[in-house]
Amino acid sequence: MPDRIALVIPVRSFEHGKTRLADAFTPDQRSRLARAMAEIVVAPRVDADTIVVCNDESIAHWARSRAAQVVTTDATGLNPSLLASRESILRSTDADWIVVAHADLPLATDIVGAVAAAIAARPSGHDCVFVATDRRRDGTNVLALSRANFARWEFAYGPNSLSAHTDQAGRLGIRVIEIDHASLAVDIDTHDDVHLVRDFVAGVLPDWTPADPT
């Protein structure tokens, strides 16, 4: 029987997201863009439990409308939020694997499928953690941990998180396996990221005028 997966997506208020793009998008456009990306990741699914971690009631309401479970926390920031909500997440699912994914992955239409394939192909007899990094090989867009490892993991999101998570796995004696999947490598944080998926952005924001790339 395949291992059961729970997909955990921390989601911040759409109105407060993507501030690094403030010179290219209006606040309303940034909010709509953040929501559109989150709706790709937080999609109704039967192949995994979907759990949204948030500290905003409007996000909680939105997540429930997407058939997701909701874990609320008073913590702010990605690492504190995951740490504070860890026990609630574990109580809300009996999944064998907990997969933490960012909410700003516009191409990630099948995170669960990509992770499940990697888990199924893992070498026997090894304790493994699975990571999908960004195109700069700096961040951790997707992090898949066994239930036991999720319970003890020290989340290190932020600059150089891939290196930090890889180092932690080494200290714990866990083998790191990278999920090399193009759909998981694109997140939208910078103007270069926007240019990579400008057709997606233009479809979401018909009132947006792209800057001249030159």
Named regions from a protein language model:
Residues 1-21:
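N-terminal nucleotide-binding beta1-loop-alpha1 segment
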Residues 32-49:
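A short, N-terminal amphipathic alpha-helix
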Residues 49-70:
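Acidic donor-binding segment of Leloir-type glycosyltransferases
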Residues 64-98:
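Short phosphate-binding loop-to-helix
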Residues 102-106:
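The conserved acidic donor/metal-binding loop of glycosyltransferases
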Residues 108-137:
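Conserved donor-nucleotide/metal-binding helix-loop-beta segment in metal-dependent transferases, i.e.
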Residues 144-168:
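Short, glycine-/small-residue-rich phosphate/pyrophosphate-handling segment
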Residues 160, 167-214:
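Conserved alpha/beta core of the MobA/IspD/sugar-nucleotide pyrophosphorylase nucleotidyltransferase superfamily
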